[in-house]
Regions:
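Conserved S-adenosyl-L-methionine
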Residues: 170-181
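Short catalytic micro-motifs in class I SAM-dependent methyltransferases
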Residues: 104-107
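Short, glycine-/aromatic-enriched active-site segment of Class I SAM-dependent methyltransferases
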Residues: 131-153
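Conserved N-terminal segment of class I S-adenosyl-L-methionine
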Residues: 1-92, 202-247
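A short glycine-rich, Lys/Arg-flanked "PGG" loop and its adjoining helix->strand segment in the class I
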Residues: 113-128
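Short hydrophobic/aromatic beta-strand or adjacent loop that forms the aromatic wall/cage
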Residues: 183-189
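Short alpha-helix
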Residues: 153-168
């Protein structure tokens, strides 16, 4: 875990979860959620399980069916809407969900491409994957700072994750992305497309352009240089702010 406590981790999650809550139509469309790497305290999972909707001043529970998976033998949350499965979060779980919530856990995947392919198959058609991943290369006090935490074997970047997600069949053209300057957290919200995961050994940038899965600014960069440059990216976040990553 990248935080000093589970509560601190949950507070960080709420920055994104509360943006979801500000879109009631989206929340009401969600029937099932899987929290990948939910942790023993499972605060994020409990958040999903206890959400309510205000319909003409009548408060009603959404009753989202929630599944948590992690390597622990138990979690500390007990709720009728929550099911827990002891399971590693790289291999395929034989169940489909509307939302996969993956906060501060994907960085531990030993085979990230395989994990993303499995996540694709764990989603319902058009389902949403939310990845929130720490970067190990960051700007601190106008200098590059490098870190290598325990069990982090990949240096994930925003553009690298978009590359992997699109190869894995996720729609990044319609996705939402954020990595603020001086913020080590990369946030990606993408959707399962009707394009099956492709072979990462043979799929080129131009192949990805043909699928329509890449952000428009990424396609423009590829058409200009033959590959995607981070400084060309202009991406939208959940609050509909546009961020240029060339600054």
């Amino acid at each position: 875990m990248s935080f000093s406590s589970a509560q601190e981790s949950h507070q960080h999650s709420l920055e994104t979860l509360e943006l979801f809550y500000s879109h009631p139509d989206f929340m009401e469309s969600v029937d099932s959620v899987c929290d990948i790497g939910c942790g023993k305290e499972a605060f994020d999972l409990e958040w999903w399980a206890t959400q309510e909707v205000d319909d003409d001043d009548v408060i009603s529970p959404l009753n989202i069916k929630c599944t948590g998976i992690d390597i622990h033998n138990m979690i500390l949350v007990n709720h009728d809407n929550i099911t827990y499965k002891q399971h590693d979060f790289e291999t395929l779980l034989d169940q489909e969900f509307d939302v996969l919530w993956c906060h501060d856990s994907f960085q531990y995947a030993l085979s990230p491409m395989l994990a993303l392919s499995n996540y694709y198959h764990m989603l319902t058609d058009g389902g949403m994957l939310a990845l929130i991943v720490p970067s190990t290369t960051n700007l601190e006090y106008n200098k590059l700072a490098f870190s290598q935490p325990n069990f982090h074997y990949y240096n994930h970047t925003l553009d690298g994750l978009i590359h992997m997600l699109s190869i894995s069949g996720f729609d990044c053209e319609s996705g939402f992305f954020q990595q603020q300057l001086n913020d080590r957290w990369i946030k990606l919200i993408v959707y399962k497309s009707d394009v099956e995961p492709m072979d990462p050994k043979t799929t080129t940038w131009y192949d990805l352009v043909e699928t329509g899965l890449l952000p428009v600014s990424g396609v423009e960069s590829i058409n200009k240089y033959g590959y995607m440059k981070r400084e060309d990216l202009v991406l939208t976040w959940l609050d509909y702010s546009n961020i240029w990553y060339g600054q």
